[in-house]
Amino acid sequence: MLTSQSKLQPREQVALYGAASLSDEQLATVILRSGTQHLPVEVVAQRLLQRYPDFQDLEQADLVQLRQIEGIGPVKAIELQAICELSRRIQNQRTLRFGVVASSQMVGQRMIESLAGETQEQLLAVYLDVKNQIIQIKQLYLGTLNSSVAHPREVFKWAVQYSAAKFILVHNHPSGQLAPSTQDINFTKRIVNCGQLMGITCLDHLIIGSSQYLSLREEGYLVD
């Protein structure tokens, strides 16, 4: 006798039909696991989705914002952030995975998904071999809202460790604006000059805004 999905608890439904069979509310129920003394988990899931319909913008919510939802305490807020980060990393690795031939366009588009909306400035390097295949992606700096003080030695320390022939730098502007600052331009020039001395090429430096990216090479700041 077949069991009706409508009569199953969400976890039972996952076991029989897979997680893809769940509605958003059921999926949230499974993730949250339990409610509170006064609120069943189903109600907490409903309130989560009222705040973030279709889970939209959930990955950008901080711990304070998540805890404003009744029924979500510090532990559940941390778990939700961890799940969002896991999802983000899986999505990035679908294209920015090791061995894939990278280009500025591909890296820029993928990094928009991962860095747009972040409130802290981050500097990353995508290290490549002689065929432009990805060797490693490394976060070099996590800064404040208005400053980034990464040093070229960090960039090249990892380039040497990974035996990289080339790399693409990426950093985000929390303001969402794409225009490079004087600091961005000067830092890029220092990196290019150091790379020429070491025989490790900086292919590009990408700035990630709210929905677009800017290539400093295309803007003429990187010259071979």
UniProtKB/Swiss-Prot annotation:
UniProt GO molecular function: metal ion binding; metallopeptidase activity
Sequence motif: JAMM motif, positions: 171-184
Top-level taxonomic group: Bacteria
PROSITE patterns according to UniProt: MPN, UPF0758
MPN domain sequence ranges: 100-222
Keyword Hydrolase: yes
Alphabetically ordered keywords of this record: Hydrolase, Metal-binding, Metalloprotease, Protease, Zinc
Annotated residues for binding of Zn(2+): H171, H173, D184
One Pfam short name: UPF0758_N
Keyword Zinc-finger annotated: no
GO terms under biological process: proteolysis
InterPro entries, A to Z: MPN (IPR037518), RadC_JAB (IPR025657), RuvA_2-like (IPR010994), UPF0758 (IPR001405), UPF0758_CS (IPR020891), UPF0758_N (IPR046778)
Family note: Belongs to the UPF0758 family.
Identification of the protein by name: UPF0758 protein LCA_0852
Species in which this protein is naturally found: Latilactobacillus sakei subsp. sakei (strain 23K) (Lactobacillus sakei subsp. sakei)
